[in-house]
A protein has these predicted regions:
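C-terminal soluble interaction/assembly domains
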Residues: 223-286
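Short, well-ordered loop/turn sites that connect or cap secondary structure elements
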Residues: 218-219
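Acidic/His-rich structured neighborhood in mature extracellular/periplasmic domains
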Residues: 65-202, 244, 253-256
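Boundary at the C-terminal end of the N-terminal hydrophobic targeting segment
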Residues: 28-32
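Bacterial N-terminal signal peptides that target proteins for export
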Residues: 2-17
Length: 286
């Protein structure tokens, strides 16, 4: 069996194995939307090892920023897309790859299972009504499944409290392609909103984001940073990975400003200072 995975196989056998792996993924997880480039890219990364979060994330530097990549089907499917990413799909992709590498799993089917667990409530089958649309819900659900852990101490720098009050999706239905096409789903989305409304979480206000020993102890390289917002009806405005440079904390993210995945040249403090609607950060650790 070792000879069959040594990379010395004839091309036709490698192709046969790859097709079998893709078929297995579809059979196990129902409808999965992906290209051959995506599936082979996943397997290549899984086989290469090197499971540090930032090492995996940096493989995607330069990948184009594209929004709404999960809305490409009339009905919800598990979408795997390594060619185009928004801030959330970038984080989910990296996290699913990391979990597979940490477990020694090297198949596309294993990756699809990990991604589904991260993206949908309780790891449910792909269903728009079960997708973790709000990042507070995403963090709570993934913490409950042992995927990430909230970081909310010490105080300082976690000096502020966010009280969640979301309704943006149900009050802006026309902004969401699939929800607009399925108005009967609105009550289910409202239930998701109600699950987190009223909850309180400690966070670091942007005034506390400084290049200090304390902050370096509280926020680690590869932590997931959720940038909070004061936009009515929303909890989170942007997400990415924490990266420490000599001059302070930076964000590795799929950027709509730069139109690609970048390691933001500005410090996070400078970045937040340019956006009045951004109030601070919450942190979770893979």
């Amino acid at each position: 069996m070792q000879a069959l995975t040594s990379g010395k196989l004839p091309a036709f056998l490698r192709t046969t194995i790859a097709v079998a792996m893709l078929t297995a993924a579809s059979a196990v997880f129902g409808q999965v939307t992906y290209t051959r480039q995506d599936s082979l890219g996943v397997v290549k990364i899984l086989r290469s090892g090197g499971g540090a979060t930032l090492d995996i994330a940096r493989r995607f530097l330069g990948v184009p920023y594209v929004g709404h990549t999960l809305e490409v089907n009339p009905e919800e499917q598990l979408v795997v897309n390594l060619r185009e990413m928004d801030c959330t799909t970038f984080v989910e992709t990296v996290l699913a790859l990391k979990r597979c590498i940490d477990r020694g799993e090297k198949t596309f089917a294993a990756y699809c299972k990990a991604l589904q667990k991260i993206r949908y409530e309780g790891g449910a089958e792909p269903d728009y009504r079960r997708r973790l649309h709000y990042f507070t819900l995403w963090m709570d659900d993934n913490e409950a499944m042992g995927v990430v852990k909230h970081v909310s101490t010490p105080n300082p720098p976690y000096t502020a409290v966010q009280k969640v009050n979301v309704d943006y999706m149900t009050t802006h239905v026309n902004s969401y392609k699939m929800l607009k096409a399925h108005p009967a789903w609105k009550p289910a989305i409202r239930e998701l909103e109600q699950k987190i409304n009223g909850k309180k979480y400690r966070y670091i206000p942007k005034s506390q984001i400084k290049n200090t020993k304390l902050l370096r102890q509280c926020v680690h390289d590869g932590d997931i940073i959720s940038i909070l917002t004061n936009i009515k009806g929303l909890d989170t405005q942007h997400i990415g990975f924490a990266v420490w440079h000599k001059d302070g904390l930076h964000l590795l993210n799929a950027s709509s400003i730069h139109k690609k995945v970048v390691e933001e040249p500005m410090t996070l403090r400078q970045y937040l200072g340019k956006h009045k609607t951004m109030t601070g950060i919450r942190v979770c650790r893979p």
